[in-house]
Regions:
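Non-catalytic accessory segments flanking enzyme active sites
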Residues: 44-117, 314, 323, 330-345
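Glycine-rich "HGGG/HGxG" loop immediately N-terminal to the catalytic nucleophile
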Residues: 88-90, 153, 157, 162, ...
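Short beta-strand element of the alpha/beta-hydrolase
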Residues: 122-130
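C-terminal subdomain of alpha/beta-hydrolase-fold enzymes, centered on the catalytic histidine
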Residues: 270-414
Length: 414
């Protein structure tokens, strides 16, 4: 298929969409998804390379590399690799090896991956990513869930996996579309799972914003949910509203206050002036990469060496999706919505759906179980993991898959 001409505007106009066809599921409705494959126009790739070749690098103060943000020397090499050696087409091919679809829901064209599980009775499972991630985060996790026997696990633990791009993120973004907060995203995903794909009962898993989406599903649609699995606990993030009742809570409150003081600046600007920042990051690929890469380094279990955990290709596949779709500004909206909405996850919200949680040691916040139990009243599994960080599906896909299997094994028939 010949690429459409690229006019220099983002998001690029060259999405390749195959003819409509029904997706696997228990029942279909009039909302028929269309099969989808990603294809960025050659002209958009050339435009990116040209922009990278003209990168204007900032000065850097003397001192420890990464002490003030993204390190200049590392970033210069990363930009060179992106311009000269990175193979975007290989990443497209990898993503396109998974069945993808688009369906119009709530006024947007929602993109999602849907992989039916192996075996006779795979359980439906929704995976929700966060910021600054994308569906690329889950590509190593998906086959471990849909075909566990291939990885030495029990084939009876198979899931049929659905991975949407969050509205306003990546391939679920088009210029001018409505912005979605967490409540609206959860409602959209519930409609996808039940009204479009026909899953009357399903599980949900997520970290970062995905953990809040998952919690919201448990609050709003408990009758549909078989279970919830979280790799970030979405409670106890507001230091002003917390008072320590135990030594463990006191320790956590100190850690939270230190993190908010030194690490939360990104959230303040994304939550107060998202449009201002969007101009810079939508126009400069190096600026976009710097903004995202610094978080992958700071939030992962990499001991300061980001390339010991992620390859450059993994990082650039995710960054590239933000770049080519022009979705970075829209992706900030959950931060703005959270600061300007009365809806929060706190002890006034009670989740009764069976819940499991993995605490990875380098997660950005790790509330103690006593705080979690104020909201999640049926915690079936609480696991403290030996290694890993915020991007668990990328950092520790096998460990995360095993935890998900263990939680849902007894819940499939409840």
């Amino acid at each position: 298929m010949k690429s459409r001409a690229f006019d220099g505007r983002y998001p690029f106009p060259g999405h390749r969409i195959a003819p409509a066809s029904a997706t696997p599921g228990n029942a279909m409705t009039s909302k028929q998804p269309e099969t989808f494959n990603l294809h960025v126009p050659d002209a958009a790739l050339a435009d990116l390379r040209e922009r990278l070749s003209r990168t204007r690098f900032p000065d850097q103060a003397t001192g420890e590399p990464w002490a003030y943000g993204t390190d200049l020397n590392w970033m210069a090499g990363f930009v060179d690799y992106w311009r000269d050696d990175f193979d975007w087409r290989a990443q497209e091919e990898r993503l396109n090896s998974f069945p993808q679809y688009k369906v119009n829901l709530q006024g947007i064209d929602l993109h999602f991956i849907h992989v039916p599980g192996k075996g006779t009775d795979p359980h439906p499972l929704l995976l929700s990513h966060g910021w600054p991630g994308s569906v690329f985060e889950f590509l190593e996790l998906i086959p471990r869930l849909t075909d566990p026997g291939r990885f030495g696990a029990d084939p009876a633990d198979a899931f049929s996996v659905v991975v949407p791009s969050l509205p306003g993120y990546g391939l679920s973004f088009t210029s001018g579309q409505a912005r979605f907060g967490i409540e609206a995203i959860a409602d959209c995903f519930a409609e996808l799972m039940t009204d479009v794909l026909g899953y009357r009962r399903f599980g949900a898993q997520g970290g970062d914003w995905g953990s809040r989406i998952t919690a919201r599903l448990g609050l709003a649609y408990p009758e549909r949910m078989s279970g919830l699995h979280l790799n970030m606990m979405p409670v106890g993030h507001n230091a002003e509203g917390l008072s320590a009742r135990t030594p463990e809570e006191s320790r956590y409150l100190g850690e939270l206050r230190a993190w908010l003081k030194e690490e939360s600046g990104y959230g303040w600007i994304q939550g107060t002036r998202p449009q201002t920042l969007a101009f810079a990051l939508t126009d400069s690929p190096a600026g976009l990469a710097s903004w995202i890469v610094e978080k992958f380094r700071a939030w992962s279990d990499c001991a300061g060496e980001i390339e010991t955990v992620f390859t450059r290709d993994q990082l650039l596949a995710n960054i590239g999706l933000y770049w080519f779709t022009g979705a970075i500004g829209s992706s900030f909206w959950p931060y703005y919505s959270r600061r300007h909405s009365s809806w929060q996850i706190d002890e006034t919200k009670i989740v009764t759906v069976p819940t499991g949680y993995c605490e990875f040691p380098h997660e950005i916040v790790r509330p103690p179980r006593s705080l979690a139990e104020g909201v999640f009243r049926d915690i079936r599994r609480w696991s403290v993991m030996p290694r890993g960080g915020h991007f668990a599906a990328m950092e520790q896909p096998e460990a995360l898959a095993q935890e998900i299997r263990e939680l849902f094994r007894p819940l499939r028939s409840e």
